[in-house]
Amino acid sequence: MKTVLVTRPKHQAAPFVRELEQYGLSTVVFPTIEIRPVAGWNVPDLTKFAGIFFTSPNSVQFFLKHLLQTAPDELKNLQQTRVWAVGKTTGQDLEKHGVSIEPLPKIADAVNLMADIDPAEIKGQTFLFVRGSLSLGTIPELIAEFGGTCVELTVYENLPPSLEDTQRVKDMLAEGKLDCLSFTSPSTAKNFFEAIGSKELSDSVQIAAIGTTTSGALEKMGIKVDIIPEYFDGPSFAKAIAEALK
């Protein structure tokens, strides 16, 4: 039985583990990032924005939870505002709350999302970008390039966890007990290799990235990526890993 290391945050690992196990794969959960809500922010008047951008399920989860607790009337304004999402899961999480989203890009990353938008729709307008503490600045940069204004709202923090099982994972790598390392964000990859080091890798271990943003971050670290799914979501990621490990 092939074994996959899962580096997702603890609260998000279970669904992905189930998907991998459905393909007969064994898993080792080693969260390399911890997600926490940011305190002390207020939900802005959403009618002031020409559109709102969400680039992860976490941004949707923490934004909507706080909105429903502190400013539930703003949900109607959100439902009446143009909303863009990166990734199928991000879009689905918004739609569960009655929020209509603009068409998803074929390749689920910020660059391709912005490439699908006519710059004329951006120029002179103000947009809201709901983000995490380590989210990339691609969307604000491109909005500014197109002549628009972007207000950034950080609703969650990406923090490195304590990584108590570091030695165990090092030992498993050294003993050839891990067949694939899976990464779902640049942060999961960065924290993993800071803790473990790339010297521990053997050629037999396959590296899987959920999308182009994560694969790009890995490649910048000098790590060759073997597996990228056709669609950048959990089920497609699990399927791609299973097919590669046959």
Swiss-Prot record:
It catalyses: hydroxymethylbilane = uroporphyrinogen III + H2O. Its EC number is 4.2.1.75. Pathway: Porphyrin-containing compound metabolism; protoporphyrin-IX biosynthesis; coproporphyrinogen-III from 5-aminolevulinate: step 3/4. CDD domains: HemD. Signal peptide: none annotated. Pfam families: HEM4. InterPro entries: 4pyrrol_syn_uPrphyn_synt_sf (IPR036108), 4pyrrol_synth_uPrphyn_synth (IPR003754), UROS/Hem4 (IPR039793). Gene3D superfamilies: 3.40.50.10090. Keywords: Lyase, Porphyrin biosynthesis. One of its GO terms (biological process) is protoporphyrinogen IX biosynthetic process. One of its GO terms (molecular function) is uroporphyrinogen-III synthase activity. Belongs to the uroporphyrinogen-III synthase family. Catalyzes cyclization of the linear tetrapyrrole, hydroxymethylbilane, to the macrocyclic uroporphyrinogen III. This is Uroporphyrinogen-III synthase. It comes from Chlorobaculum parvum (strain DSM 263 / NCIMB 8327) (Chlorobium vibrioforme subsp. thiosulfatophilum). The lineage of its organism: Bacteria, Pseudomonadati, Chlorobiota, Chlorobiia, Chlorobiales. The gene is hemD.
